[in-house]
């Protein structure tokens, strides 16, 4: 058996754009839509490629996988809920990112309140109800532009951040070695 000096599973020619995106990092959000009287199947996705644009009204912009079920449900309903996740929500973030199993489905892993905009995480202190304005293909993602029509900014707590493929607390600013 030989011991290698390089990482055996690491792509030696990692995509530099992907590496840049990983180093930018960002707050972790959970987008949900569908269910209840809306008529569409419920869907959700963990999203960290997000920004908020000020204005009247404010808008939320996010990059999502064009093939994910959330994208389809957002297009069908035109509405969604954007939750700002906290450190204690990291397992939920993994479930909605498709990285952790959820026997019974993603929405069995937490308590939800069904709204006209989609399922709202009962424990979320900060969330926005949004109406989708547009989808635009951008690289391998779709840019979702959504108008904020309802907003609750609650207790800050310890936010969940994502950097270089890992969830971090803001105090872990140096990130992984």
List each language-model region with its residue ranges.
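Basic, polyanion-binding surface patches
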Residues: 2-177
